[in-house]
């Protein structure tokens, strides 16, 4: 049996652009793509923290160092520039693989610059004002 588990996430990124007239996908700064271990064409889920929208699309690798997170195509009806989002990839693994796997968590600032890398699914960075879900 295979389980679907979190492969990686880019946490609390700020959407820089949303355009209906682009071919559907999400364009992500190459630095973030590589830090999260994503590849072009990979399926990702996007959760909009600002408005609660959720969607699935695929990754297009954008220019490195830009901080760009661009929502393209029909998804631009759901997610707007300035919205905070979590971009997540998933993978399938056996029980043994799933228990040993450490996801790639990429924490970014308001300009989508990497501020921390980790593998704790529920880590709240010190000073972020966020709470860990482990303490509920």
UniProtKB/Swiss-Prot annotation:
Disulfide bonds: none annotated. Pathway: Cofactor biosynthesis; (R)-pantothenate biosynthesis; beta-alanine from L-aspartate: step 1/1. It is an enzyme of class 4 (lyase). Its EC number is 4.1.1.11. GO terms for biological process: alanine biosynthetic process; pantothenate biosynthetic process. Binds 1 pyruvoyl group covalently per subunit. Keywords: Autocatalytic cleavage, Cytoplasm, Decarboxylase, Lyase, Pantothenate biosynthesis, Pyruvate, Schiff base, Zymogen. GO terms for cellular component: cytosol. PANTHER family: ASPARTATE 1-DECARBOXYLASE. Catalyzes the pyruvoyl-dependent decarboxylation of aspartate to produce beta-alanine. Belongs to the PanD family. This is Aspartate 1-decarboxylase. It comes from Corynebacterium glutamicum (strain ATCC 13032 / DSM 20300 / JCM 1318 / BCRC 11384 / CCUG 27702 / LMG 3730 / NBRC 12168 / NCIMB 10025 / NRRL B-2784 / 534).
